[in-house]
UniProtKB/Swiss-Prot annotation:
Glycosyltransferase probably involved in salidroside biosynthesis. May catalyze the glycosylation of tyrosol (2-(4-hydroxyphenyl)ethanol) to produce salidroside, the main bioactive component in the root of Rhodiola sachalinensis used in traditional Chinese medicine. It comes from the Eukaryota. It comes from Rhodiola sachalinensis. Transgenic cell cultures and transgenic plants over-expressing UGT73B6 exhibit a 2-fold increase in salidroside content. Belongs to the UDP-glycosyltransferase family. It is an enzyme of class 2 (transferase). Its EC number is 2.4.1.-. This is Probable UDP-glucosyl transferase 73B6. The keyword Transferase applies. Keywords: Glycosyltransferase, Transferase. UDP-alpha-D-glucose binds at residues 19, 350, 352, 367, 370-372, 375, 391-392. GO terms for molecular function: UDP-glucosyltransferase activity. The keyword Transferase applies.
Amino acid sequence: MGSETRPLSIFFFPFMAHGHMIPMVDMARLFASQGVRCTIVTTPGNQPLIARSIGKVQLLGFEIGVTTIPFRGTEFGLPDGCENLDSVPSPQHVFHFFEAAGSLREPFEQLLEEHKPDCVVGDMFFPWSTDSAAKFGIPRLVFHGTSYFALCAGEAVRIHKPYLSVSSDDEPFVIPGLPDEIKLTKSQLPMHLLEGKKDSVLAQLLDEVKETEVSSYGVIVNSIYELEPAYADYFRNVLKRRAWEIGPLSLCNRDVEEKAMRGMQAAIDQHECLKWLDSKEPDSVVYVCFGSTCKFPDDQLAEIASGLEASGQQFIWVIRRMSDDSKEDYLPKGFEERVKDRALLIRGWAPQVLILDHQSVGGFVSHCGWNSTLEGISAGLPMVTWPVFAEQFYNEKLLTEVLKIGVAVGARKWRQLVGDFVHKDAIQRAVREIMEGEEAEERRIIARQMGKMAKRAVEKDGSSWTNLNNLLQELKLKKV
């Protein structure tokens, strides 16, 4: 069969963390629906998660599958079976995990040599995949999994180092050159960015990420042009990157079953969850979740409980503890009994997109990870912003100052995995602010407009639909 008639073959290589895997699996499903032969490359421990997410697409006859390569985590100081960043036992093990991820290069190259795909979509944390693909004449597309805003702000901070001009960690500085005046403090920046931290594994890795991004074929962005047009243009015209925004990727999950099967097995039955939501009035429930990686200490969980109770709002709270012990006394005494008629507590994984899309949900308390942020935007929801680490403080600025659909809870310090401590009064205030009063209604109107815009973008002839088809057409012309 000639290259003109055989389907385009693309390898998708997500970093082993749920926040990276889920959107890339969505992306592979989206590409498969357009006739692309898609192969998702992962490690044996992560294969079941991906398999459950693509089962329905396979039944529909689309060409999508999973292949595995070995992960040598124990050689780098990781516990046996630790193959996902979300399962590392401590923040100190994060660096070991990134080192171990580098050992995937050799088996990945063997896979490329054997199968010769037409393109590789490689996660940002596999910067070497640009050179690996180039060995076999294969173009590599980078996937960061974040917003244009965060990409632009992060690069401006990295290049210009504006934090060197301030005398304290809490003194604000302006990020130079951006379309909007955005202020941050040193305490809100990733620690590996700051001077004196350049010898860290992560700092070196992120330098490689930027270098190989420039030499790659281009960047796929899980966003919508209409959401952040000034930053999409800045990324292309000022930073000189080739890019295609094809999001929101989560919208490829159309029905209840697809939304429920996304990610890990939920800790609650989807029908029980929907039944509870169906019993509530429209826009009356606050959804509280901090992503798959953030795990708060017990004293912070107790503070969240007190703040939510004092807010007087109905809520769904997804609880993930830092501690592995089975004690249940970390919540205030009598809390669950007092809120039982207006709260649903989920200990573990939640069917997030299913919940956010329900008409009863009227607000979202989020850690500002980009997947959650874009899922909230797609659902048309105002948000309480509670950034913890990674690029989340940038995303908070996008929500609160550019899009104006967010209310900051007051987290001020970047802290790996565990976050800055926030008191119950601040939590109560922020939750009420997105749910009550005229300003809350104004935010909700803006958020709803953005939700409609997101859905239009992925429909036929929408901006993201058009970008995807243009990219696929370009790749077909470049077939190996």
